[in-house]
């Protein structure tokens, strides 16, 4: 035991000797290394002085900031050497030395690195992040020395290499270092401000190449301070660092930055030479302003981005808006279109939810909408509406008015028309909002009147029939006629009359003022013209009050709004009422649309009327009670209405309209929507503008209608072939056009073969080829085999590619129906020049023909050429139309068509006889809307929302809901019967009858709400007795035999 203790004691002593010798060797080696480094430092300082003198001599080639920076660095390094030489053997702590470089005792190695262009704090901070931290520091404490595993000689050798590299980079290659490494130093400087507390002075690397590589890899690691400092400066003309100008609030380790600028340091004063103070001040003054300005600009960029963040509902772009807000931006017509179109995208569950929401919202309007709903679903909903809005045109001899002639006849005509209107009232018409007690539409005796001077409105209420007398009607009608006299026209061109006639309409077009009573119209007319009496025989030469066109506009808007309401509340199964409303819209509103627009002077008011008509058309298009034929007509009418609205907008914003508004309304300012300044030519002719503006507004009353014969900018983009059932010889073609139109045609086998032969005769030699060019495959066609060139739409270079398949698809002589359908579909792959050729145009452009275009062709002489289709694309060969008369027989009607010479005419097409469809309800030779037989939907009952209040008593015996089948037909005794005798055998069948009655009342009470709880019938239950039961085969006494023997369920 003693031997073991003595052995351990001797081994411990040996270990202490070994450690002491190791520490002594390291201390000596460190002293030698420090002495060597001091000598190298003195040499590098001498080289720097020589370089500074050289830079001062040739200042034109070097930057002045570099000289001052070098001098400042030299003086600072000399002061640091004197300070650190006294404390070279002290112990260093990383955490304390990172905050203040002058107060902490650092090693000579860290002092040497201050001579480089990179500060020691920045370079050591960048080196701690890199992966090549293999070398340990030689200036560590005694604790770190014991842990280090590197030999002292190797560490000293590496340190010497680092120091020599630093000195060489400072002395030998100073120019290249300053020019190449300064942009990279700026990137290093931007990272060092936030992480000064993490710097390790004992682990560093002085090599510039490795430092730059490290900084390049860790460049994007921490940019938390970039928004504060303004980001990287990519200006290589100025190498000033912006770190110290934009301090981040942390203390700096070095008192001098790499750019020659004093950093904000809290170090105690160091004894330096007096020459260093002006150098420091000069280095501050040398700092130029552009980097600071750039830093300010870059610093302001994030603030601008924060200020420009899009606010909610700030822009009117629908993509940036809420869907509800975007919906509210549209006009009334588009809102109706969106509502009806979006319903088709809903699922059945969503539709039920929407129906419940609508039912809950409409419930409060039941009493208000009940009379309109009753009128809309009656047998004749349009009985009380006027048969025409504007009167038919007068005979030609009444164009000019002569006093004392035809007054009596004109008065009688007007009186008769007004009496017809006054006696007709819509049944259940609710009072319209806006002051109009009744809808009256003035007949116009003068068809060729001006737009600014219109005939007055005869919309007189029923209560004021006595006001609707001769002076009111004839005074205004005389004005409408007398306005066509040229002498009166000259009087209208005066300033007061034009300002009263035109500017009043413009100012009052958008704002609807409360209208006075019809009696006040007569008073205002006589008050405005006191010199002219209001008798029958004396005409008035002054224009009428401009309020009367507004009365006409108001009455038209009320009529269109009422028709839209009628169509909206019409039941979805009431096809008869919907057909009559549709007929009224087609025969009255749409037929007199141009005359209505003529009587409205302002373009904006015309657009408002057209949008109201568009709402009606949209409701007709989507309403389920409208027939498919009418829906197709209304769908085709929508494009024309939108084109007319666009034309009116263009007319409103034309230069002539702007000049007219600027001269008539506000002479000193431009009109609404005026974008261009007034030219000198317009200013020189300013005195003639009011005359031309008023005259132009009269004679240009008709808006430009889109001509049906538009030049041919359309072509076929797709063919879809289908085989007609039970007929292998006929095929139907669905043709899609580039303008969005879709037509249908029917061709037989022989007609398709003839089309194939014509295509082969025209384009049989053209081939489809493949050309490979740099890995890109493109297809093109050649015109013939000898000269293979590309088409003009692609290129004109020659090619020697091999022959490919021909462009025209192949069709075998004995092709099957499936191959014919495939051939029709392959025609869609023909190039555009073939689609626009005469073969395709003459074959399929006739499918775009419409009846109104054919009637227009009869009035217009055709030039007889093949390409006359381009002038009138929907023209086609002569057609025979067939129509059924009242007896059901076919009455063919041949329309006169210009027969062209056969050589220049279109190819005759096979006409399919189209008969008017028979009634789908009774099979009679009439339209379904004229059928008098009750339909199946009418028998089932309507599906409209009930307008009765909740909890109202319903008579179960007379309710139409009893026609429905019960939900639970075989529900066994769900409700108890008060009469116990009903459960006996003789009354068992009566009991089940009573069960069905109760179930119908519970589950089918018209959809009315019923509170939870026991059912209490409102009507006394009628019990059926034995005489109404079914006789049983085993029953001999006339009583139900269930009580006796036999099968108990024989009656069921």
Curated annotation (Swiss-Prot):
One of its GO terms (molecular function) is RNA polymerase II complex binding. Residues 41-320, 478-543, 667-689, 933-965, 1033-1052 are annotated as: Disordered. Residues 674-689 have a biased composition (Acidic residues). This is Germline survival defective-1. It comes from Caenorhabditis elegans. Residues 1038-1052 have a biased composition (Gly residues). Pfam families: Vts1 (PF25479). GO terms for cellular component: cytoplasm; P granule. The gene is gls-1.
């Amino acid at each position: 035991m003693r031997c073991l203790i003595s052995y351990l004691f001797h081994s411990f002593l040996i270990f202490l000797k070994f450690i002491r010798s190791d520490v002594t060797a390291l201390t000596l080696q460190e002293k030698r290394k420090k002495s060597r480094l001091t000598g190298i430092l003195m040499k590098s300082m001498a080289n720097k002085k020589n370089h500074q003198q050289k830079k001062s001599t040739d200042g034109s080639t070097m930057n002045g900031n570099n000289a001052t920076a070098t001098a400042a660095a030299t003086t600072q390094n000399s002061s640091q050497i004197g300070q650190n030489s006294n404390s070279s053997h002290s112990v260093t702590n990383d955490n304390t030395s990172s905050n203040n470089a002058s107060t902490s005792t650092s090693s000579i190695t860290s002092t040497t690195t201050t001579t480089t262009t990179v500060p020691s704090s920045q370079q050591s901070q960048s080196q701690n992040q890199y992966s090549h931290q293999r070398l340990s520091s030689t200036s560590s404490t005694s604790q770190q020395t014991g842990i280090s595993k590197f030999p002292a000689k190797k560490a000293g050798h590496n340190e010497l290499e680092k120091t020599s590299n630093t000195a060489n980079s400072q002395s030998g290659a100073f120019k290249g270092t300053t020019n190449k490494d300064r942009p990279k130093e700026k990137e290093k400087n931007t990272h060092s401000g936030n992480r000064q507390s993490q710097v390790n002075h004992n682990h560093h690397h002085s090599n510039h190449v490795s430092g730059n590589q490290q900084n390049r890899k860790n460049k994007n690691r921490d940019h938390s301070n970039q928004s504060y400092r303004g980001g990287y400066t990519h200006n290589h003309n100025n190498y000033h660092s912006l770190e110290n100008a934009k301090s981040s609030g942390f203390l700096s380790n070095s008192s001098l930055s790499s750019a020659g600028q004093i950093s904000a340091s809290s170090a105690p004063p160091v004894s330096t030479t007096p020459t260093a103070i002006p150098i420091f001040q000069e280095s501050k003054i040398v700092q130029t302003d552009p980097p600071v300005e750039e830093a300010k600009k870059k610093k302001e960029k994030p603030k601008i981005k924060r200020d420009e963040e899009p606010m909610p509902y700030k822009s009117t772009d629908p993509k940036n808006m809420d869907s509800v807000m975007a919906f509210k931006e549209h006009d009334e017509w588009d809102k109706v279109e969106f509502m009806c179109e979006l319903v088709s995208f809903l699922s059945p569950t969503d539709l039920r939810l929407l129906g419940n929401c609508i039912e809950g919202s409409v419930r409060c309007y039941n009493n208000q909408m009940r009379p309109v709903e009753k009128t809309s679903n009656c047998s004749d909903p349009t009985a009380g509406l006027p048969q025409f809005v504007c009167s038919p045109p007068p005979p030609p001899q009444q164009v000019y008015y002569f006093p004392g002639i035809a007054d009596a006849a004109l008065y009688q005509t007007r009186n008769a028309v007004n009496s017809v209107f006054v006696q007709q009232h819509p049944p259940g018409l609710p009072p319209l909002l806006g002051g109009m007690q009744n809808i009256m539409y003035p007949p116009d005796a003068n068809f060729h009147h001006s737009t600014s001077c219109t005939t007055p409105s005869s919309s007189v209420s029923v209560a004021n029939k006595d006001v609707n007398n001769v002076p009111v009607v004839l005074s205004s009608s005389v004005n409408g006629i007398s306005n066509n006299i040229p002498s009166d026209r000259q009087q209208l061109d005066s300033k007061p009359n034009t300002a009263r006639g035109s500017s009043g309409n413009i100012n009052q077009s958008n704002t609807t003022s409360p209208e006075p009573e019809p009696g006040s119209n007569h008073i205002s007319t006589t008050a405005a013209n006191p010199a002219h009496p209001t008798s029958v025989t004396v005409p008035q030469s002054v224009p009428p009050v401009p309020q009367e066109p507004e009365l006409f506009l108001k009455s038209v808007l009320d009529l269109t709004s009422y028709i839209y309401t009628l169509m909206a509340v019409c039941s979805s199964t009431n096809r008869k009422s919907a057909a009559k409303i549709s007929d009224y819209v087609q025969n009255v509103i749409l037929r007199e649309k141009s005359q209505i627009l003529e009587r409205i002077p302002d373009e904006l008011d015309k657009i408002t009327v057209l949008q109201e008509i568009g709402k009606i058309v949209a409701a007709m298009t989507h309403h389920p009670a409208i027939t498919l034929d009418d829906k197709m007509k209304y769908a085709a009418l929508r494009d024309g209405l939108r084109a007319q609205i666009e034309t009116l907008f263009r007319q409103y914003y034309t230069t002539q309209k702007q000049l007219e508004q600027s001269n008539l309304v506000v002479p000193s300012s431009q009109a609404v929507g005026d974008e261009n300044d007034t030219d000198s030519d317009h200013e020189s002719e300013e005195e003639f503008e009011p005359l031309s503006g008023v005259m132009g507004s009269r004679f240009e009353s008709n808006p430009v209608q889109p001509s049906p014969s538009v030049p041919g900018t359309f072509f076929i983009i797709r063919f879809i072939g289908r085989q007609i059932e039970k007929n292998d010889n006929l095929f139907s073609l669905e043709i899609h056009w580039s303008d969005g139109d879709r037509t249908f045609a029917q061709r037989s086998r022989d007609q398709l073969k003839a089309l194939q032969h014509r295509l082969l005769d025209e384009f049989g030699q053209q081939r489809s080829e493949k050309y490979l060019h740099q890995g890109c495959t493109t297809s093109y066609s050649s015109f013939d085999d000898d000269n293979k060139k590309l088409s003009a739409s692609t290129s004109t270079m020659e090619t020697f590619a091999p022959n490919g398949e021909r462009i025209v698809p192949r069709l075998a002589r004995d092709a099957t129906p499936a191959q014919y359908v495939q051939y029709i579909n392959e025609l869609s792959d023909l190039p555009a020049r073939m689609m626009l050729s005469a073969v395709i145009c003459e074959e399929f452009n006739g499918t775009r023909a419409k009846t109104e275009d054919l009637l227009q062709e009869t009035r217009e002489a055709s030039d007889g050429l093949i390409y006359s289709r381009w002038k009138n694309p929907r023209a086609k060969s002569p057609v025979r139309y067939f129509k059924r008369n009242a007896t059901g027989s076919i009455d063919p009607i041949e329309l006169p068509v210009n027969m062209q010479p056969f050589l220049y005419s279109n190819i005759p097409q096979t006409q399919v006889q189209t008969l008017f469809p028979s009634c789908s309800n009774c099979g009679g030779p009439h339209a379904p809307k004229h059928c008098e037989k009750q339909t199946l939907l009418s028998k089932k009952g309507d599906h409209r929302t009930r307008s009765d209040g909740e909890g109202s008593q319903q008579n179960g015996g007379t309710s139409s809901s009893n026609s429905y089948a019960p939900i639970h037909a075989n529900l066994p005794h769900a409700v108890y019967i008060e009469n116990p005798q009903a459960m006996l055998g003789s009354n068992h069948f009566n009991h089940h009858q009573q069960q069905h009655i109760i179930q119908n009342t519970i589950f089918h009470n018209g959809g009315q709400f019923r509170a939870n709880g026991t059912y209490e019938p409102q009507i006394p239950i009628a019990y059926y007795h034995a005489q109404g039961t079914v006789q049983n085969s085993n029953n001999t006494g006339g009583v139900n035999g269930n009580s006796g023997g036999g099968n108990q369920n024989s009656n069921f």
